[in-house]
Amino acid sequence: MSRKISLMADQRGAVALEVPAVWLFLMLLVILPLADIAIVGFRYISAYQALRTFGQSILYSPPPDVTNASTWSATVTAKADSRYPIPSVKLVCGESNAVCDSTNSAATQPKYYVYTTTITVTPLVLRSVLCTSSNSNPCSFTLTYSERFQ
């Protein structure tokens, strides 16, 4: 049997034609969507950890006046991670999520710091699935975090 007939009989060359199709299938339908999900997940986890770290930093240096956050919030927001800026800090007293003032800041009421940051994701493949935010940019998500301090 000749060499050409031998190769055609066991079809060893067929894999050379199948590999590009399999590679394209794996890249477009499996790996790129998984990469999109992983990138969004890492960005979310990083932002949430930045919020937790910020909460710990202000937990160990409490505000001098819980009824007036405007006097100290500018200095503490400067301590936040620059990749995840925190626009404002709100002090909430009690379980009703009301902003602290002289009427609801009794020592028996629990007090919380509440603050937010925004992340923007740029998925390559799964834009219609991952970009579902109600913000003006559907790929931008606002994360809220609260830390009890009293």
Model-derived features: positions:
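Alpha-helical assembly-interface signal, strongest on the long, hydrophobic N-terminal helix that forms
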Residues: S2-T77
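A short linear-motif detector with a strong N-terminal bias
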Residues: E18-P20, I37-A38, A69, C93-E95, ...
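A generic structural micro-environment signature
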Residues: W23, P64, N97, R127-T132
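Residues embedded in well-ordered secondary-structure elements
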Residues: D36, N104-A106, S134-S136
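Short amphipathic secondary-structure patches
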Residues: Q49, T53-T120, S146-R148
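Low-complexity, S/T/G/P-rich flexible repeat/linker segments used as non-globular hinges
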Residues: T118-Q150
